[in-house]
Design a protein with these regions (language model features):
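Intrinsically disordered, low-complexity polar/acidic regions
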Residues: 1-168
C-alpha cells in the first residue's frame, strides 16, 4: 500500500540519448523528451515506463540524475546491489505534496555479466526498477490514534537523523 506505481528507470549514456528517445517515442506513441530538474553532465537516469500510467504520466521522461538526492540514491543502489530509498522528495506527479515522497530503487543488471565488485556492477547496470511512495498514502490505512501504537519514521544519513515524523 502506498506505492503510486511500479516502473523502470533506464541508464542512458549521453551518446545513446538519441537512440533511446527514438525507442521511447515508438513505445509510448507520444512525443516524449528527456526532462531535467537541473542541468548536469554524465549519464541520464530516465524514467522509461511506470504503471499505472494514468496517474504517473508526468514522470515519464524525467532524468532522476538531474537532482542530487535522487541521483545519490540510484548510485548507491547500483554500487551496492541493494534496494535504496531516497531522502524526502517531491514527486513530479504529486507536486502539491512537497517533500512528502520517496523513491524505492532496486538496480537491474544486464544478464550474464559478473557482479562481484562495484566496478562489475557499474559496468553491468541497465537501470533500476522503482516505486514512488507518497508517505500520506503509505500511512493512509494505519490508525495512529491507538494508544498501544507508536510510529516513528527517521531518515538516516551517515548515521544521523535528518528527518523525523512521529505519532502515537
Amino acid at each position: 500500500p502506498g506505492a503510486r506505481g511500479f516502473g523502470f528507470i533506464r541508464r542512458v549514456p549521453v551518446n545513446g540519448e538519441s537512440a533511446f528517445l527514438a525507442q521511447l517515442r515508438r513505445d509510448a506513441s507520444a512525443d516524449i523528451g528527456i526532462r531535467q530538474l537541473e542541468p548536469h553532465g554524465g549519464d541520464r537516469y530516465v524514467i522509461q515506463n511506470i504503471e499505472p500510467i494514468e496517474r504517473n504520466l508526468a514522470a515519464v521522461g524525467l532524468d532522476i540524475a538531474s537532482e542530487a538526492n535522487r541521483r545519490a540514491a540510484a548510485d548507491e543502489a547500483a554500487r551496492t546491489g541493494r534496494a535504496v530509498i531516497t531522502r524526502a522528495i517531491t514527486l513530479i506527479q504529486a507536486p502539491s505534496q512537497s517533500q512528502r515522497s520517496f523513491l524505492l530503487l532496486l538496480p537491474v543488471y544486464r544478464p550474464g555479466l559478473p557482479l562481484v565488485s562495484r566496478q562489475d556492477r557499474q559496468a553491468a547496470l541497465a537501470g533500476w526498477t522503482y516505486a514512488p511512495l507518497l508517505i500520506d498514502e503509505v500511512l493512509r490505512d494505519v490508525d495512529l490514534n491507538q494508544p498501544q501504537f507508536a510510529l516513528a519514521l527517521d531518515e538516516l544519513t551517515d548515521g544521523r537523523a535528518m528527518l523525523g515524523i512521529g505519532a502515537g
